[in-house]
Every structure is written in structure tokens, then in C-alpha cells.
Regions:
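Domain-level marker for long, solvent-exposed, non-transmembrane regions
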Residues: 1-246
Length: 246
């Protein structure tokens, strides 16, 4: 048995996991390969579940926290994992079987469909905020309507700062004002494509459809956690840039 791998690819919007299986003793031929493949799928689903549990929702919570606290989320997440598809498979020379399985982060069959409604239900009501749709690059990219200036989106350049992707990040200014967060989003859009998009560079963020033709590009001052966490999933911009976004 080999060590299996699993990973969340935020830029691609997928979660993948590798699984290995061996046939039971005394089985041969096609029956052995079928049983080895079945075992590999079970192993991949188990690794996928572990990876999904560790996905950061915000600075202080992971998917696992929601699964533990909500039977509805647990049931939805379990169904999504079982619905993952085999995207790569291979019979090994020793008779073992290897598969790679993938599930989407977004869309009606994606992890967001289980998590975003739970985020909404756990978000206290607030006065109607400015409508913002953004893109962050890890750089963060968001689609934001900004004060009639004509910007089609916002790109926050947080490259080299150790930004950790999450489902529900917040953009703050240096005065601690929340510029963008769950209060600003359209939940259907967040399920279909995420609150923000993550890219490896500003140039790749500018190519994202959500950024539009004329995005506002601002440089993050730093990354930060939440009130009770140091997980660097949120970005901080200057007060002036915060005003430009709003």
C-alpha cells in the first residue's frame, strides 16, 4: 500500500484525492482487478473526506466544524464525496490499483452548496451594504461595483504574504473596517463561483471572467486572521484603497 495524496486546488476550484487498493488474497484475473479498484475508490473517498474536513471556511472554522455541528451539512458533504468522479486510474504491476478522484469546490454539486447556506444561516442580519463582487489573488480577485467609477472588479494583490484560501474571507482596511465579506455577497453567486477567486499572479487574476475588462488592482498591506484566530485568510488594504473599493 502506498501513501495517498489529497489536495484542494483553489485556483482550479477542485478537490482531488488519490487512493490505492489491493485485491483480497485468493482472487485473480478480472475479479481481482475489480475488487482492487473498488478498494482504491473507498481509499480515495476516505482521503477526500479528510481533505474536505480541513478546508478553511473562515479564519476560525473549517468544514469539519460545520459537519460536527450540523447533521444537514454532514449529510450533504457525505453525499458530495460519494459523488466524486474518478479522473485518473491505473492498474499497478503488482496487481494493486490506483485512482484519482475529484469533486468541485463550487456549483450545485460542489462543496460550496453545502457550506454557503450554513454560512448564511450563521451570519447575523446587518443593514444592506454596498453591493460588492470581488476577486482576490493570492492574490485575491473579487467582482465589485465601486462608486460608479467604472471598475468591473477588484484584484487584491497579496502575493508573498502567506495568504491562506478560504470560503469566506474578509477584506479589511488598516482601521479595521470590513470592506468586503459575507454581508456583501449574493449567495447563489457564491455557490456557483465562490465569494472570491484565487490566482497565482495578478496577470492570471486579470484574465478571470469575474474580474471583468477593467478591474481595480490594489496592493494588500498585510494578511490577518479573525478575532480569535491567526489563520491568515483575510487581507488588509489601506484606508484609501478601502474607500476606492467601496
Amino acid at each position: 500500500m502506498q501513501a495517498a495524496e489529497a489536495a484542494a486546488q483553489w485556483e482550479q476550484g477542485t478537490i482531488t484525492a488519490e487512493g490505492f487498493g489491493t485485491p483480497p488474497m485468493g482472487t485473480y484475473g478480472s475479479k481481482a482487478s475489480i475488487m482492487a479498484r473498488r478498494a482504491a475508490i473507498v481509499d480515495a473517498q476516505r482521503n477526500l473526506a479528510e481533505q474536505v474536513s480541513g478546508v478553511q471556511v473562515d479564519a476560525e472554522t473549517t468544514v469539519e466544524n460545520y459537519v460536527i455541528s450540523s447533521d444537514l451539512v454532514k449529510t450533504k458533504v457525505s453525499a458530495l464525496i460519494k459523488g466524486a468522479v474518478v479522473v485518473e486510474e491505473q492498474m499497478m504491476p503488482d496487481g494493486a490499483y490506483r485512482v484519482v478522484m475529484s469533486m468541485p469546490m463550487y456549483g450545485t454539486q460542489g462543496l460550496a452548496s453545502a457550506i454557503m447556506p450554513a454560512i448564511r444561516d450563521n451570519t447575523p442580519p446587518t443593514p444592506p451594504p454596498p453591493v460588492i463582487s470581488a476577486t482576490i489573488t493570492a492574490e485575491i480577485t473579487t467582482q465589485v461595483q465601486t462608486r460608479g467609477v467604472g471598475y468591473t472588479g477588484v484584484i487584491v494583490d497579496a502575493g508573498g504574504m502567506g495568504l491562506k484560501p478560504s470560503f469566506s474571507p474578509v477584506i479589511y482596511d488598516t482601521n479595521g473596517r470590513a470592506i468586503y465579506g459575507v454581508s456583501n455577497i449574493n449567495y447563489d453567486q457564491a455557490i456557483s463561483q465562490g465569494m472570491v477567486g484565487y490566482s497565482s499572479s495578478v496577470s492570471s487574476a486579470q484574465a478571470l471572467p469575474r474580474a471583468g475588462r477593467s478591474p481595480l488592482v490594489v496592493k494588500a498591506v498585510q494578511v490577518r486572521g479573525g478575532n480569535n484566530s491567526t489563520n491568515p485568510v483575510n487581507v488588509v488594504v489601506s484606508v484609501d484603497d478601502g474607500d476606492r473599493i467601496l
